[in-house]
Amino acid sequence: MKSIIFNEIKKILECDFALENPKDKNLAHFATPLAFSLAKELKKSPMFIASDLASKFQNHDCFESVEAVNGYLNFRISKTFLNELANQALTNPNDFTKGEKKQESFLLEYVSANPTGPLHIGHARGAVFGNTLTRLARHLGYKFDTEYYVNDAGNQIYLLGLSILLSVKENILHENVEYPEQYYKGEYIADLAKEAFEKFGKEFFSEENIPSLADWAKDKMLVLIKQNLEQAKIKIDSYVSERSYYDALNATLESLKEHKGIYEQEGKIWLASSQKGDEKDRVIIREDGRGTYLAADIVYHKDKMSRGYGKCINIWGADHHGYIPRMKAAMEFLGFDSNNLEIILAQMVSLLKDGEPYKMSKRAGNFILMSAVVDEIGSDALRYIFLSKKCDTHLEFDISDLQKEDSSNPVYYINYAHARIYQVFAKAGKKIDDVMGADLQSLNQDGINLLFEALNLKAILNDAFEARALQKIPDYLKNLAANFHKFYNENKVVGSANENDLLKLFSLVALSIKTAFSLMGIEAKNKMEH
């Protein structure tokens, strides 16, 4: 709606201007401070200029009023125009807030957890954010592809195989074993050990077979990770292997050398990242000739940046913050614009239950399993809470609040608004088609404000995507639900003289809730279950 109004205003003003959303919708739906920016050029007061501009909008069909207030130009949209927008939305509900196809393209790499165990709650935040960003981008018309980078070549994979081998020796063959300082533990390792022993037999379990054992376990873990993601309604387009990039390492090193991005010292090859803003240079090839994790990651990012996407986005854990300058430095040395590599950081999550820290899973070792939380509160509640705060801020929540059936549970509260609307339609014995002819002229000021809020969803979605601030969507839904409940409690609907106008208004509110929830990966309920 905002873009439509902007274009209507621009037809009259014929210049560039900023269009703002005043908090008090009783004053105006939209406002522009244009008069202030013209004051110096025209050598007139902002109030005089605003009054002059307001006079140009007399008898405009879109606006109920256009007023000059303290130098601002305030616009109130007419009921007739709001009704036209409502009719468009209700006639084509599947296209409500959808954007036209755009030329911009994105590649999002996210989750990319080591395939050495099940996903934990820390992985879940970035996973939910990335999946919602994907849904939103595609809804708005962008080409948006997703990818999972499988770290299948490093020491972590070897440790997975070693951990299983030691578990077999200790728990099945009853041998005395000495565990290294770093290894994987938890019931899932014992389960893998048991399954591997049944599959391969006793003779297989020797050090020379650790790589084969690790590969087998890695594949099992990838299947489990995909299941964990699907449980939370997350699907990633493609999975790419770290190993598949090793053959391209030499060519990448040559390119870096050509651009003076690397040098040799102390028998190692260093990335000269301090030249590009990093705090120090980084080793990419060790003394023994083995590449570091950074080396493989540079090759992978070089490939991503070469595929023709307008922007490559990564979602990383907040502990990778220091990794950003070195990766951007490498991309600049390779001739790419590092601004086209965008990094979103997912901060830590603290989980409580009844006010106490949530118990760690014995199955996972010392982590809270993502699947355990989904089993307990459902994927809808999990997704909502992870989207409720900016991704790069610490999140603490008590899962007990998400099991309550009252206003303290935002998922319940918003769903109750949606279900309540269906209940009102049922009580009135009507369907949406029965109220499409309503013209909304009888709506009071609160009703108009609620209608405006419901129709303003697309502006919220655009802002949320452009700022990567997905918390704007649940914030919007909470406010919309609160305003709906308040309006419902203050106005008689069924049997009132303006029943059809109110039902049409409510149908717009329901459509906005359903659309926004769908983009969050949440199902809007038509009926509340108790």
UniProtKB/Swiss-Prot annotation:
Q: What is the E.C. number? A: 6.1.1.19
Under InterPro entries, the record lists: aa-tRNA-synth_I_CS, Arg-tRNA-ligase, Arg-tRNA-synth_N, Arg-tRNA-synth_N_sf, ArgRS_core, DALR_anticod-bd, Rossmann-like_a/b/a_fold, tRNAsynth_Ia_anticodon-bd
Q: Where is this motif: 'HIGH' region?
A: 113-123
Q: List the catalysed reactions.
A: tRNA(Arg) + L-arginine + ATP = L-arginyl-tRNA(Arg) + AMP + diphosphate
Q: Which UniProt keywords apply?
A: Aminoacyl-tRNA synthetase, ATP-binding, Cytoplasm, Ligase, Nucleotide-binding, Protein biosynthesis
Main subcellular localisation: cytoplasm
Record GO terms (molecular function):
arginine-tRNA ligase activity; ATP binding
Q: Which GO terms describe its cellular component?
A: cytoplasm
Its subcellular locations are: Cytoplasm
Q: PROSITE patterns attached here? A: AA_TRNA_LIGASE_I (PS00178)
Self-association and partners: Monomer.
Spell out the protein name for this chain.
Arginine--tRNA ligase
Source organism of the structure = Campylobacter jejuni subsp. doylei (strain ATCC BAA-1458 / RM4099 / 269.97)
**What taxonomic ancestry is recorded?**
Bacteria, Pseudomonadati, Campylobacterota, Epsilonproteobacteria, Campylobacterales
